[in-house]
Amino acid sequence: MLLETGGAVLHARRYLEGCGHFLIHNVDVFSNADLKWLSDQVRPEAVATLMVSDRKSSRSFLFDPETMLLVGWKNNVTGEVILSEDTLTEDHCLAFPFSGIHLMSDRVFGLMDKYVEEKGLEVDPQAGVRFPIVDFYLWAMKKAPIYGALSNDLKMLDVGKLDSLKQAEDMLRSLNL
């Protein structure tokens, strides 16, 4: 059973609990992400720090412009908006697409347990539970601090498709590694 990112993180709990912070990186994202820089952006109170960039995307997370605290999400195609508070408006937020690269605190597991329980998700004793990380973040943003870290120099490519591999090869060459 594919658990999606949220379920996979929860399933790996026994390996990650007690480690402080850990990196989650979508396997089909090829990038020049500066992971040391991302680590330096982590605030002590954050349960997650999400690397975002200023680029075109069909979906964006919404952040408080002063703190980069996650306060919502927008589907840029349909116009659907989810906000953490009724008093917020989309025009008072910064919108940035998520890179699929994030650092989580091991304190996230207690929140994930509450999410699974509150949502009534089915848990397979062997395989675990399936849930998308974005859905979890949109629920958790009302309960714990999740911050965005805007990477101005981030270049990324979705290599989950065969036609992207040539672009990835060209990008790798341009990085002069």
Residue spans for each PLM region:
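Catalytic-core segments of class I nucleotidyltransferases/pyrophosphorylases
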Residues: 20-25, 30-31, 35-43, 55-56, ...
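Short, solvent-exposed polar/charged micro-motifs at secondary-structure junctions
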Residues: 5-7, 59-61, 157-161
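Short phosphate-binding loop-to-helix
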Residues: 1-23, 82-85
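Short beta-strand-to-loop element that shapes/binds the nucleotide-sugar donor at the catalytic cleft/hinge
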Residues: 48-66
